[in-house]
């Protein structure tokens, strides 16, 4: 099942109502808020800058250098099992040579203590150490993507790197996920997962903390 999930989720990537947002990890840690302004609406995310400093820091570099501006959500993978809607949306630079930065060291969930729960932001990658400017947002719990130290498969020992969670705008994520895909777009097992009309990320910006009185 894990291998099937890998083929479905990799790039190369308790039930909640549609209006509920993803729950952040219970323990307090430093987070940086970012809003992704898309043509479908705004998605606000909390980046785990303390728990996943390398991965969250990489995402913030793309934000601060305007590298996501004008990029798109281009993939909507729809899974027909589990709570619905299920799957992910994926966006980012698509390896645009004018936007993409070098790959970053991998931060497994066994180190960060994070998990692929509903609303998780996770880096797309071919193998550990290759993640750069493409990321996924999960519509349901997908903890099978977390690192599994007992696995004999090196891919699953490392898992995928979670670095943040949606805190507002999950309905926008679901709306993007529900948009039509093109049956002729994509290659291999990803054929049919590419969106017929990608959704533009107009801009990505940090949200500054509200000033206290």
Predicted regions, residues:
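Intrinsically disordered, low-complexity segments enriched in polar/charged small residues
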Residues: 7-8, 202
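A periodicity- and composition-biased signal for non-globular, repetitive helical segments
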Residues: 8-9, 96
């Amino acid at each position: 099942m894990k291998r099937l999930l890998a083929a479905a989720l990799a790039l190369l990537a308790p039930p909640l109502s549609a209006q509920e947002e993803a729950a952040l990890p219970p323990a307090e840690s430093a987070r940086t808020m970012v809003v992704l302004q898309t043509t479908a609406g705004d998605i606000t995310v909390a980046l785990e800058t303390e728990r996943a400093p390398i991965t969250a820091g990489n995402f913030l570099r793309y934000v601060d250098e305007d590298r996501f501006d004008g990029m798109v959500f281009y993939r909507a993978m729809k899974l027909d099992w589990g709570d619905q809607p299920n799957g992910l949306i994926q966006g980012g630079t698509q390896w645009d040579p004018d936007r993409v930065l070098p790959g970053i060291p991998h931060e497994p969930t066994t180190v960060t203590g994070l998990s692929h729960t509903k609303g998780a932001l996770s880096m797309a990658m071919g193998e550990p150490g290759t993640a750069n400017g493409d990321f996924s947002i999960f519509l349901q719990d997908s903890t099978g993507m977390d690192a599994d130290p007992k696995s004999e498969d090196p891919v699953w020992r490392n898992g995928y790197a979670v670095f943040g969670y949606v805190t507002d705008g999950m309905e926008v994520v679901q709306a993007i996920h529900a948009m039509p895909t093109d049956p002729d777009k994509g290659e291999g097992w990803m054929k049919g997962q590419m969106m017929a009309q990608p959704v533009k990320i107009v801009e990505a910006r940090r949200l500054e903390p509200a000033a206290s009185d």
